[in-house]
Amino acid sequence: MYAIIKTGGKQLKVEAGQTIYVEKLDAKEGDKVTFDKVVFVGGDKTVIGTPFVEGATVEATVEKQGRAKKVVTFKYKPKKHQHTKQGHRQPYTKVVIDAINA
């Protein structure tokens, strides 16, 4: 059985036991989180939500909070001695999918 959930402005296909990276969630390591915005549930019985499947949830455990690799941006104006270097590290949450309840 698999499901498509919506979190952090993205839609992700998940299965039980899978490890995924999502946008930062307000939870500590070891906490249980529930995703209730389930768009689609597939398997023996397929259910498509309008826009979400009623009563369907995906349970997960937070494994790690972290920050992604640094993305460096560099802008410059030729012949003007003007340049800007800036870096950004996006925070993420690593979760393990425990169960899909549909």
From Swiss-Prot:
GO aspect biological process, one term: translation
InterPro entries, sorted: bL21-like, bL21-like_sf, Ribosomal_bL21, Ribosomal_bL21_CS
Classification via SUPFAM superfamilies: L21p-like (SSF141091)
Pfam families reported in the protein's UniProt record: Ribosomal_L21p
CC terms in the record's Gene Ontology section: cytoplasm; ribonucleoprotein complex; ribosome
Record's keyword terms, sorted: Ribonucleoprotein, Ribosomal protein, RNA-binding, rRNA-binding
Alphabetized GO MF terms: rRNA binding; structural constituent of ribosome
PROSITE patterns cross-referenced by the UniProt entry: RIBOSOMAL_L21
PANTHER family for the chain: 50S RIBOSOMAL PROTEIN L21, LARGE RIBOSOMAL SUBUNIT PROTEIN BL21M
Family (UniProt): Belongs to the bacterial ribosomal protein bL21 family.
Function description: This protein binds to 23S rRNA in the presence of protein L20.
Assembly notes: Part of the 50S ribosomal subunit. Contacts protein L20.
The protein's name in its UniProt record: Large ribosomal subunit protein bL21
Organism, scientific name: Ligilactobacillus salivarius (strain UCC118)
Lineage: Bacteria, Bacillati, Bacillota, Bacilli, Lactobacillales
